[in-house]
Amino acid sequence: MTKIKICGITRESETEMLNRMQVDYAGFVFFEKSKRNVSIEQAKEIKKHLKPSIKTVAVTVNPALDLIDEIIEAGFDILQIHKMQEFHENLKIPVWVAYQVRNREEAEEINVPDGISGILLDAPEYGSGKTFSWQDFPMKKRREWQERRIPFILAGGLSSENVEEGIRLFEPDVVDVSSSVEGEHGKDYKKVEAFVRKVREHE
């Protein structure tokens, strides 16, 4: 069964819909240039209201070790790293490494380090609402990760309109959505509900 991650949680009120819909992961962004950026303290307060069954993901961009230590101390379940410069082994937290897919050539050069807990594929531009070119992606890479039993997270431009196609093509372990389920004031209940329904209808 494909699991669901709702990313970019910024308000306590959003936890109610995640709890009600029994999603699997809630993502909190720790990157100042993002409009969804929150502080560690804000995230700690918000995540108190999530059901224990919902795992929390700390989303970062090439984080300093000090930030990683804060994330671990705050009790997050998973560390997600974009633009990783160096993979630090022996971190006391599972790590998802995110790669932006710009073209087929770059995708073919993705080398996933040993010891990570998941690989996430994202669009060339964060939060653009656009997918990377699914049809151009070298599926031999996907099969390689399956053989290595590395959990795979599909992100970047997913919506209730295209998530079924993404699941059919990639057979991801997790689908990750953010911008397409937002309204004027954060996450929109009906949009989140529509996305969750499409994922579960596909099973």
Regions found by a protein language model. Give the residues of each.
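Conserved N-terminal beta1-alpha1 strand-loop-helix module at the mouth
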Residues: M1-E203
